[in-house]
A protein has these predicted regions:
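Twin-arginine (Tat) signal peptide motif
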Residues: 1-7
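Active-site acidic/histidine proton-transfer and metal-coordination neighborhood
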Residues: 11, 40-42, 59, 78, ...
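Active-site beta-loop-alpha junctions enriched in small/polar residues
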Residues: 29-33, 58-60, 91-94, 121-123, ...
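Hydrophobic faces of well-ordered beta-strands that scaffold small-molecule active sites
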Residues: 24-30, 53-55, 86-91, 116-118, ...
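Mobile, glycine- and charge-enriched loop segments
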Residues: 20-27, 76, 80
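Histidine-acidic metal/acid-base catalytic patches
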Residues: 7-11, 20-25, 36-48, 169-184, ...
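Glycine-rich, proline-tolerant flexible connector loops at the mouths of alpha/beta enzymes
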Residues: 56-74
Length: 307
């Protein structure tokens, strides 16, 4: 073994923790592996071909917040040994008052994981929206200050839907604009963005939040009728209406570097799409579905110059 090879091996854990081996590591959302433990999840993610894992560090997730000091290092040892990155986790943290927030941040700093997905806010449907945003902003300010103290970045996931703060994107921009995106930022989900603005809205949202984005999530959908109502029908990557190539081209042009989370939130997976803790379809079928979408994702990433 040469000296250069030795140094590469010594650097591997740090690279795995930060995702520094690539600008855009494609990560599996561990919510879809809640039916098994860290060891099997890691082995399957390595087999399927993911660059990393977005661990659920929240109540009911792979890591419980109150046990993070003990459980996170054990999980990372397994994941990093397999050569997979952990550039982020998905957390339960809303603001500094969230139970175990400081404990989680301490563990993330110690582990060298720089980013976490930030749990979101909801509107009270009976109150004016501007007044509620004014009340939320100090909570964002305090979280930004806490993240600066720990050297961390919170990424606000953009969900679609009624009473979701951030669904319209402009409200999220108003909450983030006065703070450094290295402390509080967006985790821009293009599937949800397209559901909220399928013609031009998602394009404006990407232009608006692009400079504030530190993580992106990819999922696809097409409108589905349920009774008299139309709802997003989540589907396999490339089978819906999301323009992934245009989105990725735009987000790259905005200077984005960070984790890409691939979400599988459609019923073909028999419940594990929503975090079910047992399989209802054969494991071989699950692996084939995960591989199929990852391969489709990598094709579009190459077309956008991000692979």
């Amino acid at each position: 073994m040469t000296r250069r090879q030795s140094l590469t091996l010594l650097a591997a854990p740090a690279l795995a923790a930060s995702g520094a081996n690539t600008k855009w590591p494609v990560c599996m959302f561990s919510k879809h592996f809640q039916w098994t433990g860290i060891e099997q999840m890691t082995a399957l993610c390595q087999q399927i071909g993911f660059d990393g894992i977005d661990l659920t560090l929240r109540p009911g997730g792979h890591i419980e917040p109150e046990a993070v000091a003990e459980e996170l290092p054990r999980a990372l040892a397994i994941i990093h040994k397999a050569g997979l990155a952990t550039p982020m986790v998905t957390s339960h943290i809303v603001d500094p008052s969230t139970p175990h927030a400081e404990r989680v941040m301490t563990a993330l700093k110690k582990a060298g994981i720089p980013r976490y997905r930030w749990d979101g806010f909801k509107y009270d449907a009976k109150r004016p929206l501007p007044a509620q945003l004014k009340e939320i902003k100090p909570r964002v300010r305090d979280l930004a200050a806490m993240n600066k103290q720990f050297g961390l970045c919170a990424m606000y996931h953009t969900h679609s839907g009624v009473n979701r703060v951030g669904a319209s994107m402009w409200d999220l921009y108003s909450l983030l604009e006065d703070f450094s995106p290295d402390q509080v930022s967006a985790n821009l989900d293009v599937g949800h963005a397209t559901a909220e603005g399928g013609f031009g809205g998602w394009i404006h949202s990407t232009r608006l939040l692009g400079p504030h984005t530190r993580g992106i999530a990819l999922k696809d959908f097409a409108w589905k009728k349920e009774g008299k109502n139309w709802r997003p029908g989540w589907c396999a990557f490339g089978q819906g209406m999301v323009d992934f190539k245009q989105f990725l081209t735009m987000i790259k042009a905005a200077g984005f570097q960070g984790p890409i989370q691939l979400h599988y939130e459609y019923p073909e997976l028999g419940g594990i799409d929503a975090g079910k803790k047992e399989l209802t379809i054969p494991q071989e079928r699950v692996v084939a579905i995960f591989q199929r979408d990852l391969e489709a994702c990598r094709i579009v990433l190459r077309e956008a110059g991000m692979a």
